Curated annotation (Swiss-Prot):
Inhibited by zaprinast; inhibitor is however not specific to PDE9A. Specifically inhibited by BAY-73-6691 (1-(2-chlorophenyl)-6-((2R)-3,3,3- trifluoro-2-methylpropyl)-1,5-dihydro-4H-pyrazolo(3,4-d)pyrimidine-4-one). BAY-73-9961 has two enantiomers, (R) and (S), due to the presence of a chiral center, and both forms vary in their pattern of interaction. Specifically inhibited by PF-4181366 (4H-Pyrazolo[3,4-d]pyrimidin-4-one, 1- cyclopentyl-1,5-dihydro-6-[(3S,4S)-4-methyl- 1-(6-quinoxalinylmethyl)-3-pyrrolidinyl]-one). Specifically hydrolyzes the second messenger cGMP, which is a key regulator of many important physiological processes. Highly specific: compared to other members of the cyclic nucleotide phosphodiesterase family, has the highest affinity and selectivity for cGMP. Specifically regulates natriuretic-peptide-dependent cGMP signaling in heart, acting as a regulator of cardiac hypertrophy in myocytes and muscle. Does not regulate nitric oxide-dependent cGMP in heart. Its EC number is 3.1.4.35. Residues 87-141, 564-593 are annotated as: Disordered. GO terms for cellular component: cytosol; endoplasmic reticulum; Golgi apparatus; nucleoplasm; perikaryon; perinuclear region of cytoplasm; plasma membrane; ruffle membrane. It comes from the Eukaryota. Zn(2+) binds at residues 316, 352-353, 462. Induction: Up-regulated in left ventricular hypertrophy from aortic stenosis and following heart failure with preserved ejection fraction (at protein level). Binds 1 Zn(2+) ion per subunit. Binds 2 divalent metal cations per subunit: site 1 preferentially binds zinc, while site 2 has a preference for magnesium. Tightly binds zinc. Changing residue 516 to A: Induces a dramatic change in inhibitory sensitivity by BAY-73-9961. This is High affinity cGMP-specific 3',5'-cyclic phosphodiesterase 9A.
Amino acid sequence: MGSGSSSYRPKAIYLDIDGRIQKVIFSKYCNSSDIMDLFCIATGLPRNTTISLLTTDDAMVSIDPTMPANSERTPYKVRPVAIKQLSAGVEDKRTTSRGQSAERPLRDRRVVGLEQPRREGAFESGQVEPRPREPQGCYQEGQRIPPEREELIQSVLAQVAEQFSRAFKINELKAEVANHLAVLEKRVELEGLKVVEIEKCKSDIKKMREELAARSSRTNCPCKYSFLDNHKKLTPRRDVPTYPKYLLSPETIEALRKPTFDVWLWEPNEMLSCLEHMYHDLGLVRDFSINPVTLRRWLFCVHDNYRNNPFHNFRHCFCVAQMMYSMVWLCSLQEKFSQTDILILMTAAICHDLDHPGYNNTYQINARTELAVRYNDISPLENHHCAVAFQILAEPECNIFSNIPPDGFKQIRQGMITLILATDMARHAEIMDSFKEKMENFDYSNEEHMTLLKMILIKCCDISNEVRPMEVAEPWVDCLLEEYFMQSDREKSEGLPVAPFMDRDKVTKATAQIGFIKFVLIPMFETVTKLFPMVEEIMLQPLWESRDRYEELKRIDDAMKELQKKTDSLTSGATEKSRERSRDVKNSEGDCA
């Protein structure tokens, strides 16, 4: 969400006044007359003098609030406009001493009291300097106005100028106050939206301090690193979470049900509200008697227990949950599964990467972290995600299953554990083989078949970024590579094995995606299409297009590399020939000597 304060920024105009640069600042609330008076004051001309602005190439500039801004290098030149007083048949009410009617032509004359010394160069060639004007029937040409009359006129003009000045200052003050109030209101709104982010940062700092303290106090431990703090207690907020409840528009509600939903447009508060809406929309709050306040506390605590990793963060959690929600509607899963299964699918999707440290299972095992030791090298991260999920649910304030009978909770717990453990990509081939075997005679009434289908569904959602439009999917690739490179850099520094697809010196965006799309994503979604044909157009077609796009990108990269090699070869060859010529010249000079 943007600041919004830039719309209230005043405009600055630079004027060239006899070779001196004068800066004039005004707000968008000034009118053309106000701006012209400011320019007159800046240039030393009387107020209400008609002036024109010229650019450096003598083009005229309109004097109004929307006039184009300039810089000190391109100041505008100010020129007074010479207005020729045309004669008009105005009858003078006063008769001259000779009894004649004063209907003779008017002569141009400067008004007494406003005459200013003429500046050199004030009028360009081709302009007409105003001639002095003689009031009709009052004085003969060459006759001076009496001093008392001149003093009276000057006094009146001074009072009028003072009144105009006060009026302009009041208007400017009002505009400035309104401007500041609007900016302050916008800032208050923005600061309110940052409350959750600030609390999240505080929580992360606290966790880092506790982790550092735990590391420094640990001695003679075979584990190199610890991502756990045994004394950490997940304490949710006792009060109702402070994130605002957004009212989703009908367009947002409709878009939320589709895989094309743009997950990058939403702030954490808005994502929390969207997740809350999903539970209400699917009837889970109603069917399982979930307290709405408890649901909000649970979502807030889940948000707090996702780390700020480049990829495995709360936005990824929302991305997976939203894809699961869209598949429920796309494939009409509520007709195939019970509400308990829908609750398991949605809750497992939200919790599937809780407290992810940003380093995968391979690193955990090779570095002998506390997670790997605790779970005996068997899916250490996925086991940890499950443990954190049920630590949160163990808190009464966050237990969204508190009104479910013990047998029902046991079924939900076992289902969530099964699905979260299935997200370990080391088990991908095993799960796919089992599912393909069941696909030959798939039975929706068979519990084993349905469990495998749920495992495939959460796997599809977990790695479904390329199903989304290119502008939504591509930033996720950059985030994932950044996390991979962080891990490979750490593995290099610690002398651990480095996977080629994580090495910043070997992998590119195209090479990273082509194999994954061709051999993991497309086969898995093709299998799902056999049960749900509607998946082909909505999800499989974007995968084919993504594969073709990255293959084309790889061809371009390869061509550029080949061209670079040829260029380097030619350059090195030319350099070698130049060295040989230099040696030949030196040898010939030596022979001559």
